[in-house]
């Protein structure tokens, strides 16, 4: 399986790239900074240097062509202003969806955010803008003719993954290791039955395979 991952140098993406490469898949990470290429190669991924904030659908389509799936795991990151929440967390996610649609790549997995729809549209606070950007991106992806899955994790931590989560359409506030989010992304890619589903996920007690299976019963 060839999987193109936007935000290829993010911590979730690097976990996912290692997991995919370990089982013989071909992860292709899109990065903005050429200095990050070596890190992706060390993780077993191919790297493509492309700035999604300043790219066209045609340019992204060149990277996506021939992929079995795309994953959006990019983000403006801590310390960025409101403007980049819109250009990265919203616009780049939509750009990847348009490129996937243009090239016939139907499988789109989106890393969104817990509580993305519960934001204050009148608030200038950066976090509220971030949630609004994620919500808008999710809505745009749902509106496209793609086999999408939208994953909304809680607060992200760098602790080792436990392989156990609480996963549902809506869950209470909580945190989750980035490694577990990557495991969910990997497993979702193997489950066409999760297409058309949006869910929240935090740390919990249910093994990830069982939690994902509960979505489709």
Question: What label would you give each PLM region?
Answer:
Residues 1-25:
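N-terminal Rossmann NAD(P)H-binding glycine-rich loop of SDR-like oxidoreductase domains
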Residues 6, 26-28, 34-36, 76-143, ...:
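Conserved Rossmann-fold NAD(P)-dependent oxidoreductase catalytic core, especially the SDR/UDP-sugar
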Residues 29-95, 99-102, 190-193:
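NAD(P)H-binding glycine-rich loop region in Rossmannoid oxidoreductase-like domains
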Residues 70, 151, 181-185, 201:
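Non-catalytic, hydrophobic alpha-helical segments
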Residues 93, 133, 172-187, 197:
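Substrate-positioning beta->alpha
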Residues 118, 143, 149-169, 201:
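Flexible, glycine-rich beta-alpha linker
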Residues 120, 160-165, 188-197:
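Glycine/proline-rich active-site loop of Rossmann-fold NAD(P)-dependent oxidoreductases
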Residues 198-206:
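Short-chain dehydrogenase/reductase
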